[in-house]
Regions:
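Ferredoxin-reductase
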Residues: 36-111
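An N-terminal, well-structured beta->alpha segment
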Residues: 1-59, 63-65
């Protein structure tokens, strides 16, 4: 089954069948292109698939000329605060939140939120 959702809060789906590393690279590349480079923070949660998606997002962002700051395992409020405090151009949060274990999500946001 392929379940993939794209909305204002990012992209989320079943890991492997809908949400893949290849898709994450494309999604991060689109975000990096939209930001026109700049500095982007990336953070993850503790899901087993999150490091794979972090690596994919790094690849996509770096390919578009972004500088990437690795925040490691970091909750969303801390990442939002860091973007404002450090003057980053945006961030990508990788984490499943309230979704079941086989799902994950990639949530981009700019310095404006």
């Amino acid at each position: 089954m392929r379940f993939l959702r794209l909305g204002p809060s990012g992209i989320r789906g079943a890991v492997g069948s809908a949400l893949t590393a290849q898709l994450a690279i494309k999604y991060a590349s689109a975000f990096g292109t939209w930001l026109d480079g700049g500095t982007v923070g990336v953070a993850i949660d503790t899901r087993t698939s999150s490091p794979m998606f972090k690596a994919a997002c790094f690849a996509g962002l770096l390919a578009t000329g972004c500088n990437v700051v690795d925040f490691g395992i970091c909750p969303a409020p801390v990442l939002h605060f860091a973007v404002k405090k450090l003057g980053l151009d945006g961030a990508m949060l990788i984490g499943g939140g309230h979704h079941q274990g086989g799902w994950n999500a990639i949530m981009p946001f700019s310095k404006r939120g």
